[in-house]
Amino acid sequence: MKKNQTMQGTFSKLFGKKHAHPSTTSLYATNPPWIFTHEAQEEGTRDFDGIYYGDNRFNTVSESGTATLKARPRVRPLLTFIPLNAQENHGLAVPTPSVPEDFADKEVGGTSTLVNGNLRLYSSVGDLRPACYDLDSSIPPPPPGPAPGPPQDISQPPGESPPPPPPSVPPPPPPPLLVEPPPPPSTAPPPPPPLDILSPPSTPTPPDFIPPAPPSAFLSPPPPSLPAPGPPAPVSLHTPGTHLFPPGAITKWKSEVALNGRHPEDPRTSPPKSPAELKRSPLGPSPEPHLTFPRSPKVPPPTPVRTSSIPVQEAPGASPEEEEATQKTSAPSPLPPSFNIRPASQIYPDRALEPEQPREPRPETPGSPRLRQSEPQTNGQAGAPPPAPPLPPPAPPLPPPAPSLPPAAPPLPSTELAAPPSSGFMKTSKSNSPALKPKPKPPSVEDTASSEPVDWRDPRQMEKLRSELSAYLCGTRKEDRSLSHRPGPTVALKDKENNKGTSLSEEAAPPSLPEKVHPCIPEKSPSSSSLPEREATSSLVLPPVDYIAQDTPAPSVRQIRSELEARFASSAEKEAKPSLASLPPKPRLEGGRTFENGTDNGRFHKPATKNPPQPSTTPLPTTILQPKVVPGPATSPKVTPGPATPFKPTPGQAILPKATPGLTLPLKPTPEQTTSPKNTPGKATPLKDTPGQATTPKDTPGQDTPPKDTPGQAAVLKNAPELSTPSSQLMAEKDLASVRQREKPETQEDPVATQLSTNGTLSPPALPPKMSTSGEEAPFLYRPHRSQNSHSRGVAVVTPTRARGEAPDSGDVVDEKELQNHPAKSLTPGQPADQLLRHPVTGEVVERGSPMALLLAARQRAQKTRTGGTAIGRSSLPGSLRDHSNQPEASSDSIFYRGSRPNSFIVVPKVPSETEDSHLTSARPTGPSHWKPQQGPDTQGSEPTYRHGWTKAETPAPVARERPAPSSLPQSRALPKSFSSPPSPSYKREEEEEEFSFDIIPPPPEFSNDPEPPAPGQQHQGRRGSPPRNNFSDLGQSWGPNPTPGFSRFRGTQYPESGGLDRFSGSGRSLIKKRLYVGESHRNPGMPRGSTGRSLSSPNCFGPQPGGPEMRRVNSAGRAAPGGLHARRLSLEGARGATEVKFKAPGGGGGSSSKAGDYGFVPAKGSRSPHGNTHYGSPINTFTVRPGTRHPISYAYPGTHRKATS
């Protein structure tokens, strides 16, 4: 029957064969009689029914059950079946519809069903949510709030409503608050209502939520996250936060949260959990028993609810206005999962109430790492709910902040918190994600809390901040947040930049240091600073919390803090100056460092808010969130108003204010400027900073973090795509996170935690963990993501160079430098954040959330992942590379890698970002001069030349990287954003000339990860058909014109590289494999260079691209001696003429071939001569290996090269 149905179904239905008869008759009362008749005939018994009835009705009655089954199969066939009537009858199983209707009714009205349906409906059906949700929530009905609240919270769609919070307010404070709730109300008297609503709601919600989630698990885990949302819930965070989040997050997160394993927070949540659970039971069930109970089971549905419901839910309860705003914003927010953030939103209200509260909780929680953690989560927004949907949530957090913002407007604090929470949320997400992280944070939190409590803990301060924020956020933030949402990211970046600038200018250095320390925990490094920062952060509201999350990573926090403190002590002063003064050349090193400092600062300028180290992260989020939330004004308002106020508390800490101004200013700066401003704000140095910092952070993390970077980046990318707008912001945030992380990289663990928090939050928790793994890398990940793969790569690449080279250069700042590298990296992330994704074809900046953006982000992620591999190689490499970094520092990352590690060297594949980074690295290492030129040349136009010289002088590879970097950087990393900075045709052309290889051949499909590179690559392929020769020229130029400078570096590097190349040749396969994975990553990101270079240079293991930066890198490495190289090229060319030609052909560019040839040639050089051949054979083999890894390489080059080589 079914077979008939299915196969014959269409005909059966058409002809009314038995196929549909029983079902039709039974389920579909209105099957056409003819159909039924036919069906009846065929069906026999059923047929009988059908016939008997003639209509299907009889059958329906008789064969309800059967009919139902049939109905489903039939629905499909019916759907296929054209007749609408029949289809309707058949397809629409009346019974099924009935059931759904019942469900809908029950869902909406019923308890269990409602819960299931309700949540689901709420979630899926916005309809329910508004109608049922708002109303159903009992939000209206249970104005009391307690009853409605919990259920609603639990219900999330319905429960999200603050109503539950209010009811829960009373209870939540005790349970959730644990310590904070009261303060929240107290602290946020004005917001108290919201706070109460939020906070208490948090608690109630957690209870409500908890039951739904896994009441316990969810509450615990999600609640922590959720609590994060609830500032008040800081302590109670879980509970309140959970509640807050639970409404939104819980819905989705119930299961997810449970899964997320907020369990770590569970303990924290535990107490709340009980109350929450109890409450939930009584409250939830009472207000919406169906919702509450179903909630638990209905955890999945809540997910959708989370999106729309959460905002609504909270909106109603907490501040009608705020919650509503949240709801509106939240609900509107595209990312429902993100809208776990709704909880963030909720948190915002909470925050609004508790903007300071969270901070306060922090103070209170100081002793309570968990609380603090909780709080961070609360603030961070366990908003972390994003943990489960980390990415989505992160995005939502941003939006939620916006939503929150509107609502927060009234309770500015909320917004403030909200924005930060958003950030925090992201971070928290991370936190949540890494529930552990939060814990690590605790120490930080404690420290921070202890220190931080000072200022913002003051209810008075809170109130003031709130008022201010209210004023700012009210108008600006609401608007900006919404409007700026998208801009937000940029703004965030800008803010950051500005922060950076401001920070830089202001206490930038010290705060920066604190920030750096902050990674440990602001207060860690400079307790005072930290504290103020924390306070500032507190002021920032979320940022501190966020930062806590980030601080969480402060596992090493204390340790790092000490370190950082020491470092920062000297570095702060030193760095502060370099940051400001060193900008140019020095900043390269120092600038880098400075920028590191600046980055610290700058990085932290980015996080000006971030400045308070925690704020750093938080600011980042804050900034980001703020920007996002308070896009332009928001940023200002958020940072300025919120932070301003908070900063006020922090005023002591210029940083926060700095952040505020910085944020504000940066906000103004264009996103591009963000990159630039980041740099620019940093000062001229910032530029450097951006590149340098990007480089530096990249560098540092690069070593460690690069791999992580990749994951992080992936996460970020994910986030970016998911967040789209948030992406920008997230990116920025991530960048910040990255920056923070970068800062933290010092505390790699910390950074990891932090990054996890920051990035993790932004990234999926998983990523955060990844990040966690490589604290530093995580940031890089972000940055790479943000920046582009380039960044990731750049990070990796730059890290060694910068960290090693630069750090060494800046002897005293070396440590700092590294620290700063992280900050720099941080900046870079900002930069990346700043760096918008650019359409590979159009070159247009892609909207964060757009599909293209997602694709690009994915590509970046992939590249980064590869880069991650590469980065990892690099990471490991970095040690050696770093050591080598000094030597090859100018040379190029790739060289470093090659020199230090042939395998790693691949990592170098400079993505545009990498190029940037390299550029930065190179530029920085090269010296201020280059750096400056880079700045000057930053402009694409000039840069190429500059770069050209640079490349040659400094190192083609880095230049390749850097070139795009400067161009990108100044340009706001537009190019880098493009992933293949080179992708830009103009850019590429310039690059071509400078480093033809890398752009010449579009990456094979495998490389296609770099969307841009392929297009540009292909373009360039044709274009580079001749350019490749240019590449040769380029190389030749490097050899001939700038052999000494470039090659000198290369020589130093090259010689090692020679060894490296040989090594590469020898271990070509390993390298290739690595490169395939990593290199490919590079190829994708650095496709122009890596892909083209590698593809073209594949024969050479795609190590050094003859013409491309990569070639330069590898080639340069290979061509230790310019003359020798040249000669080698010639000989190799002769020997490999066919190969080259072939290569060219396969490469798609004579130049490419040349390059490839060159590349191959490189191996052919002197000692490589044999290698050249061998390399050719081997590289080809390697390529073969590569092909195994990636066919493109193998098919593209192996055959040709091998043949030619052979």
UniProtKB/Swiss-Prot annotation:
The keyword Cell division does not apply. Keywords: Methylation, Phosphoprotein. Residues 351-363, 454-467, 568-577, 732-747 have a biased composition (Basic and acidic residues). Residues 133-547, 568-837, 859-1206 are annotated as: Disordered. Residues 139-151, 159-234, 384-413, 1001-1016 have a biased composition (Pro residues). It comes from the Eukaryota. This is Uncharacterized protein C6orf132 homolog.
